Regions:
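Non-catalytic interaction/Regulatory regions outside core domains
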Residues: 1-133
Length: 133
C-alpha cells in the first residue's frame, strides 16, 4: 500500500526526534507540517540546490534564525546554528515525486539527536512518503 498525503499528517504528529518537521511540494506549498515557515524563507530553502557555493556561503534562514550549511549533496543540504551540545541542526531533503518534480522535507533537531540520526531519518521519510506523491 502506497503512503498517501493524509499519512503525512499522521507522520508529522508521530515523529518525535525533530523539533520541526514539514513537507513541501515543488511550488513551496505545505503538504504537512508541525509549523508554518515564512514563504520567502521557504523559497530560498527550496532553492538551496541552485548554486552550491552560494548556499554554503550564505547558509539557510528559518524563522529568522541563521543556520550554517556544512553539507551539500544532490539530495541533501544540512547544517546547524550554535555550538555542539547547545545548538540546533537543520536538514533539507529533496526527492522526485511521481510527476518528476521535486518534493521536499525540512527538519530541525536538537541535542541529543545528532545529524547522523536526524538526516538519515529525514532521507528515509522523504524516500518513503514523497516519491509516491
Amino acid at each position: 500500500m502506497e503512503p498517501e498525503e493524509a499519512d503525512l499528517d499522521d507522520l508529522v504528529e508521530e515523529e518525535d526526534i525533530f523539533t520541526r518537521l514539514v513537507f513541501y511540494n515543488h511550488k513551496g506549498d505545505t503538504l504537512a507540517g508541525s509549523f508554518t515557515a515564512d514563504p520567502s524563507e521557504v523559497a530560498i530553502i527550496l532553492g538551496a540546490w541552485d548554486v552550491r557555493d552560494d548556499t554554503v556561503a550564505a547558509g539557510l534562514y528559518l524563522e529568522g534564525e541563521h543556520y550554517e550549511v556544512h553539507r551539500w549533496y544532490y539530495n541533501l543540504v544540512y547544517g546547524r546554528k550554535g555550538i555542539a551540545g547547545d545548538g540546533e541542526g537543520i536538514g533539507v531533503c529533496r526527492v522526485k515525486g511521481k510527476d518528476g518534480s521535486y518534493n521536499y522535507g525540512l527538519v530541525t533537531y536538537t541535542y541529543p539527536i545528532l545529524s547522523a540520526r536526524a538526516i538519515s531519518r529525514l532521507l528515509h521519510l522523504c524516500k518513503k512518503y514523497l516519491t509516491v506523491l
